[in-house]
């Protein structure tokens, strides 16, 4: 999926002129962390407990461990997504975001369970999923925090249903994402 702002602006312009754009520039904008979180929650897609805050504000919630993620963009560098186990770590991450000019953060509870990556096409039977731990599939190496997947049983059909629901809410018919399958088999989408 395109991420460069100039490329997205060009796609948006072409789309507005009537060109066929498979994953809409508007949908790509919806996948920026803050709007993505808001849309997934609004549309009832199973998602971690989340808080959206200004990086200038103090984090007052008691939700640890957690993930602190830049809210104004996709993760571009490793430091855009950080794991925190206490308030001091969250405050240090927010301070780093402020120094880098990042105005908003999304804080997600850390979900215990098996990390699953998936890819699909909304409205079709195409859906592929896998555990990233055995094949060392990683963007920034943070998947190791969830550890090696235990193979918790879950409904692939339900994950496909929820993924298609997310794709529709975000307006991205060709998609990929991450979820965590909890001990009871419930998948919750944490990235799309």
Regions found by a protein language model. Name each.
Residues 167-192:
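Conserved metal-phosphate-binding beta-hairpin within the catalytic cores
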Residues 66-69, 118-120, 185-192:
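A short beta-strand motif that forms the metal-chelation/ATP-contact edge
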Residues 1-54:
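Conserved N-proximal alpha/beta basic substrate-recognition cap immediately N-terminal to
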Residues 39, 53, 82-86, 120-121, ...:
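Short beta-strand-to-turn element immediately C-terminal to the catalytic PLP-Schiff-base lysine
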Residues 40, 61-79, 102-116:
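ATP-grasp fold ATP-binding core
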Residues 30-35, 76-78, 138:
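Short, charged, surface-exposed secondary-structure boundary motifs
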Residues 27, 55-58, 71-75, 88-90, ...:
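Short acidic/polar capping segments at secondary-structure boundaries
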Residues 83-170:
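Phosphate-binding site of ATP-dependent enzymes
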